[in-house]
Amino acid sequence: MQLNAKANKKKKNHLKIIKVVDGDGLIVENIFNNQEFEIRFLGIDAPELKPCRKLIQDERETHLAAQFLMELGRKSLKYLLEIAPPNTNVSILVETENEIDLYGRTLAYVFLEDGSCLNEIMIQEGFAKPYS
C-alpha cells in the first residue's frame, strides 16, 4: 500500500485498541489521557457486517448475495481481531487534509508496534480491498 506522498501527515503514538468494530474500523484510546476515538482505516474497504446502504451497493457492484458479503465481513472482523485484539498498542498516521470522515471517524493508516501496517495486511490477506 502506498501512502499519498503529496499529503501532509501527522503521527499519533501511544494508542491502545479498545474495540475492533469491523474489518476496517477500531476504537482506540490514548494511553496518556484516556481519550477514546474511532478510526476508519484509510485506503481500504472491508465487507459490511449488517444490512445497510453500503451493503446494497456492494451487492449490486459485485453481483454477490448480501448474506455472502456479510459472511466475508465476519471473516474480516475475525481476522483483524486475531492480529490486533483489544489492548494491542498501535500508532496511526493521518493525512492532515483528510483527517475526519462524514461520521466523525479519524481516517488513518494503523501501525502495530513492529511497524507493520494493518491497512496493508488486510488487503494483502484478502480481507479488504483498496479504496480511494
Regions found by a protein language model. Name each.
Residues 1-132:
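Small beta-barrel nucleic-acid-binding modules, primarily SNase/OB-fold domains
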